[in-house]
Each structure stands twice: as C-alpha cells, then as structure tokens.
Amino acid sequence: MSDARAPLSVVIPTLNAAASLAPLLAPLAEGAAAGLVREVVIADGGSDDDIAALAEGVGARFVAAPRGRGRQLSAGCAAAGGPWLLILHADTRLPADWQGAVADHIEHHGGAAAYFRLRFDDRSAPARFVAGWANLRSRLFGLPYGDQGLLVPRPLYDRAGGYPEIALMEDVVLVDAIRRTAGRGALRSLATTVETSAERYRRDGWVKRGARNLLTLLRWRLGADPEALAAAYEGRGRGLGQGQGRGGA
C-alpha cells in the first residue's frame, strides 16, 4: 500500500488493536487504489498481538515506538513521507464518502487542517448527545479530539510543533498549536462523519465517562502533568489502549 505520487500518509497508533483494524484498513486500501493514499503507517506501542504481521500482510509501514499515544503519533508522523497526514484511531470507521471529502479539502484548503464530524456505533439518546456535544465543541471552540481524526498538511504540522511525546492530551496540544500558528480558520470541519466505538462509555457509563473527560481537560488546562492525568484517567496498572482513551466528550 504505497504510491509516492499520492498525497496522503495515514498514521494509526495501535496497542493490541489487530483485531479491530480490518474495518479501517479496507477503505484505506480503496483510497490507495484511487491514488489518494500514499501509505499507511502503523505506530505501535508494544503490542503482544500479531499487529506487525498484519501490517506486513497489507503493505502498511510498521513503526515501533514507546508506549503512549503522543509518543507513538510523533514517531509515526516522523516516519510518514506524504505532504498530507491523516491521523486516525484504530477503532475509527470511515464513511463511504470519506475520499471525496478529504480530496476536496486538499484541493481547496491546502493550508488548513480538518477533522471529521463524529458519531458512535450506538444510537441511544446518550450517545447522540455526547456526539452532538463533541461536534458543537469542535465548531465553537476549534477543539476536536483524536477520535474525530485529523487531516493536516505537513508544513502546518511541522510549524505547529507536531505531536508532543506525552501520554494524554496530545490531540489537544496539537490543535491548540495549529490555532495559535495559523488562526481559527486553519481548522475546518470535513463534510462527512466518522464512527467510533462507544465501548468505553458502555463500560463506564455515559455520564461518568463524559464527566471524567471534562474533568481531565479542565485539569490539563490548569497545568496538571499529562503522565499523572493518564494514570488517574485509566486507573492504576491499566494502560492507555488505542481507541480506548478519551471519547467525544
């Protein structure tokens, strides 16, 4: 899955995510066949599943990195060779029209970053509320989270300083830097919606998980250490698995 003429390098951080990747890799392979996707970079944080073999089997580039999504994304983006980066979580599901939305942005908004609208694989009222809040937050405050994906031109990514090598809040740090570097207009919403897993909300409860997300963001804004936040957020002795970090709230 490599075409040096295509513009888009897709970077996916993983941690024991081999079983969940197939539904994401299939549309990316279609994007490669269409001349949009240049490469897929899997930035792994020390999985004990067969992710390396899976990457080799589908023609993706495998990058081993220290565990922690910020560190993995920093390594994956450093290894990527395309003029555009698309960062996706392993449990993201792309819509049928994703290629058109991404290609349109690349053609008409070459200096700006973009994110997808969000929904969950759950059609309950709490799921719709949390996704609606995430989309409103992104529009009003220019603050999409990582599970909405991030499409960014390499020059803007580099000017903004790239992903910080921290365990949590790496997505917030980067979009904050993009706004400071290039202004609010440099962060746009794509005209389509990705779907992400609601498992973490179903496990913890929609209210509890949403409140925890907001409290974590507030503590970060007040200067809390991201490593301490990650430990408190995920619980002592539990790691930050890919696709199981903060959600739409």
Model-inferred region functions:
Residues 1-3, 176-249:
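Hydrophobic helical membrane-anchoring modules
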Residues 7-9, 39, 173:
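Cell-envelope/extracellular polymer assembly enzymes that use nucleotide-activated donors
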Residues 16-32:
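Short, well-formed alpha-helical segments that are part of the catalytic scaffolds
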Residues 44-52, 92:
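A conserved acidic beta->alpha catalytic loop
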Residues 85:
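Short aromatic/hydrophobic "clamp" motif used to bind/position activated sugar donors
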Residues 96-126:
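Conserved donor NDP-sugar-binding/catalytic core segment of glycosyltransferases
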